Amino acid sequence: MNFLLTWIHWGLAALLYFHNAKVLQAAPAQGDGDRQQSEVIPFMTVYERSVCRPIETMVDIFQDYPDEVEYILKPPCVALMRCGGCCNDEALECVPTELYNVTMEIMKLKPYQSQHIHPMSFQQHSKCECRPKKETRIIQEKKSKREKGKGQKRKRKRGRYKPQNFHCEPCSERRKHLYKQDPLTCKCSCKFTDSRCKSKQLELNERTCRCEKPRR
């Protein structure tokens, strides 16, 4: 009789244990989600993450290799260390001051023709600084020259020069490297010519500005 009661006792204990384990496994972890949603990131952490520094950035390969338009590249983008972040003055921009190259293997495909893995070199940034923007430097240089008093005629000539292209809308958000733009008229045209495409046994698609395989 005692033996039977002992087995019943252990059986009930085992059932209770497995039942509680399933309940705990099915229930969401209380506190973790609430803590993440209500967490306030400290100011210094936010500030340190925003400063100008090299950060991992996904870069379109065609941005660095615009002449490879006849190929399909896989992957089409790569992770590189590039300068990013904020500067405390709108007249400054985050630019690289130290560079180095890294070589990566990229697959190059020609539809219905061939495919091969090819080493390609990419530039990475190891050090960044906040420095005056290009248009800011132009304004500062013109102001410095005017202060030296080179004559009213030369002042007027310098004053007429403005970097017009800063007001032009980009030709294409995704494929800027395939277009060239007139800084005065903002007119867009294909960077590659039909003769260049034909030299590679391709033809120019004027809509996409890419060298493509001739249609039959």
Swiss-Prot record:
The keyword Disulfide bond applies. Keywords: Angiogenesis, Developmental protein, Differentiation, Disulfide bond, Glycoprotein, Growth factor, Heparin-binding, Mitogen, Secreted, Signal. Expressed in venom gland, heart, brain, liver, skeletal muscle and kidney. CDD domains: PDGF. One of its GO terms (molecular function) is growth factor activity. Glycans are attached at residue 101. GO terms for biological process: cell differentiation; induction of positive chemotaxis; positive regulation of angiogenesis; positive regulation of cell division; positive regulation of endothelial cell proliferation; positive regulation of focal adhesion assembly; positive regulation of mast cell chemotaxis; positive regulation of peptidyl-tyrosine phosphorylation. Residues 140-161 are annotated as: Disordered. Residues 1-26 form the signal peptide. Pfam families: PDGF, VEGF_C. GO terms for cellular component: extracellular space; membrane. Residues 145-161 have a biased composition (Basic residues). It is found in: Secreted. Its main location: secreted. Disulfide bonds join 52-94, 83-128, 87-130. Belongs to the PDGF/VEGF growth factor family. Homodimer; disulfide-linked. Also found as heterodimer with PGF. Interacts to the FLT1/VEGFR1 and KDR/VEGFR2 receptors, heparan sulfate and heparin. Growth factor active in angiogenesis, vasculogenesis and endothelial cell growth. Induces endothelial cell proliferation, promotes cell migration, inhibits apoptosis and induces permeabilization of blood vessels. This is Vascular endothelial growth factor A.
